[in-house]
């Protein structure tokens, strides 16, 4: 699988990257909230979704050690918005809904000699009443409404 990668399992589209884009967005954004912003990390994820790019910072910051080869910049774009977007970061672990996607930062699986955290994702089947009432033109399959994400410690 490439990095970043977009793939589908049973009609659910996943997007994932190993690059810590959330911390880079956090350190390079120009935004000041009047009060403490409890949804700051989800707001950063929203930038990824709005720009439809796994790396929405161009050009990369001068102090960035991200291994970005600009010849492959097109591969950072996603044509279909992922239902579940996994953006691992050293920042606090989080999970939340951004538009019609679920954004997850499972943090790091290993932290030095101690265990870290991971995301346990459960997606329930689409209820029969939603299947029967759906039209051919309807493309929404309600993934955020039928998904539970638990961030667990090892």
Predicted ranges, named:
Residues 1-154:
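Extended recognition/assembly regions associated with phosphoester-bond processing machinery
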């Amino acid at each position: 699988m490439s990095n970043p990668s977009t793939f589908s399992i049973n009609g659910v589209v996943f997007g994932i990257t190993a690059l810590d884009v959330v911390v880079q967005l956090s350190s390079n954004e120009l935004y000041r909230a009047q009060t403490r912003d409890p949804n700051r990390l989800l707001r950063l994820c929203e930038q990824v979704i709005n720009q439809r790019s796994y790396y929405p910072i161009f050009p990369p910051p001068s102090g960035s050690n991200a291994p970005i080869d600009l010849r492959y910049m097109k591969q950072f774009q996603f044509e279909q918005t992922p239902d579940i977007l996994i953006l691992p970061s050293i920042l606090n672990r989080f999970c939340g809904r951004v538009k019609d996607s679920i954004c997850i930062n499972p943090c790091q699986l290993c932290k030095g000699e101690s265990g870290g955290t991971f995301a346990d994702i459960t997606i329930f089947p689409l209820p029969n009443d939603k299947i029967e009432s759906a039209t051919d033109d309807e493309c929404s399959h309600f993934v955020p409404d039928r998904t539970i994400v638990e961030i667990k410690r090892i």
